[in-house]
Amino acid sequence: MSFTVVIPARYASSRLPGKPLADIGGKPMIQWVYEQALQAGAEDVIIATDDKRVSAAAEQFGGKVCMTSPNHESGTERLAEVVEKMAIPADHIVVNVQGDEPLIPPSIIRQVADNLAGCDAPMATLAVEIESEEEVFNPNAVKVVADERGYAMYFSRATIPWDRDNFAKQDKTIANPLMLHIGIYAYRAGFINTYVNWQPSALEQIECLEQLRVLWYGEKIHVEVAKEAPAAGVDTPEDLESVRAIVAKQAQ
């Protein structure tokens, strides 16, 4: 089973400008992500960017680049442009790996591709069991519930499912496992264009979760439990320092 990884990499991050080029252990962040994707066994790895500085950095380490429009409103729109420009066949599997996850395990990149290959959905993703009370009630931690076959029923920033009896207690015991969504997706390439041509749905606008558009229009997303929990991505200067510390420790 072959698959392609596309890594959207925007230079203009509001919280951390120039994020793809941030130095981590002597390499730009985007190079870390690229190398993790190669280790996953991808047939092709493509960096999708709208900035020549990112493109130039990628070319220095031998990365393959697709220049994209600066006007995309989402990473999925950027993905659709790559599929069109690179003439990726409709039945080919494309994995979208965020450009700010330098420590993403190659195993889960491969896993989400295998997940899609083994089901009849046009899209697949991963989740891990929530272990901390803080994440259960944190709206930035997106929860997912799936049916008995692993197809997503809903994604939410709210606490789903709501454990009525246990959450009524003062200590809000986590008696039943809740699943935390991991933001990595595999798509059948032909579906990406279908997705971006749908109008945004009311639910995705309320929750600010793009994947809800897929469920709104009656399509399926298959969810599998990740074999390995990924490290946190880099959204802030503090996150960047944490990743640098991890890399420095591993190098010792």
UniProtKB/Swiss-Prot annotation:
<comment type="pathway">
    <text>Bacterial outer membrane biogenesis; lipopolysaccharide biosynthesis.</text>
</comment>
<dbReference type="InterPro" id="IPR029044">
    <property type="entry name" value="Nucleotide-diphossugar_trans"/>
</dbReference>
<comment type="similarity">
    <text>Belongs to the KdsB family.</text>
</comment>
<keyword id="KW-0448">Lipopolysaccharide biosynthesis</keyword>
<dbReference type="GO" id="GO:0005829">
    <property type="term" value="C:cytosol"/>
</dbReference>
<protein>
    <recommendedName>
        <fullName>3-deoxy-manno-octulosonate cytidylyltransferase</fullName>
        <ecNumber>2.7.7.38</ecNumber>
    </recommendedName>
</protein>
<dbReference type="Pfam" id="PF02348">
    <property type="entry name" value="CTP_transf_3"/>
</dbReference>
<dbReference type="InterPro" id="IPR003329">
    <property type="entry name" value="Cytidylyl_trans"/>
</dbReference>
<keyword id="KW-0808">Transferase</keyword>
<comment type="pathway">
    <text>Nucleotide-sugar biosynthesis; CMP-3-deoxy-D-manno-octulosonate biosynthesis; CMP-3-deoxy-D-manno-octulosonate from 3-deoxy-D-manno-octulosonate and CTP: step 1/1.</text>
</comment>
<dbReference type="GO" id="GO:0033468">
    <property type="term" value="P:CMP-keto-3-deoxy-D-manno-octulosonic acid biosynthetic process"/>
</dbReference>
<keyword id="KW-0548">Nucleotidyltransferase</keyword>
<comment type="function">
    <text>Activates KDO (a required 8-carbon sugar) for incorporation into bacterial lipopolysaccharide in Gram-negative bacteria.</text>
</comment>
<dbReference type="InterPro" id="IPR004528">
    <property type="entry name" value="KdsB"/>
</dbReference>
<dbReference type="GO" id="GO:0009103">
    <property type="term" value="P:lipopolysaccharide biosynthetic process"/>
</dbReference>
<dbReference type="GO" id="GO:0008690">
    <property type="term" value="F:3-deoxy-manno-octulosonate cytidylyltransferase activity"/>
</dbReference>
<keyword id="KW-0963">Cytoplasm</keyword>
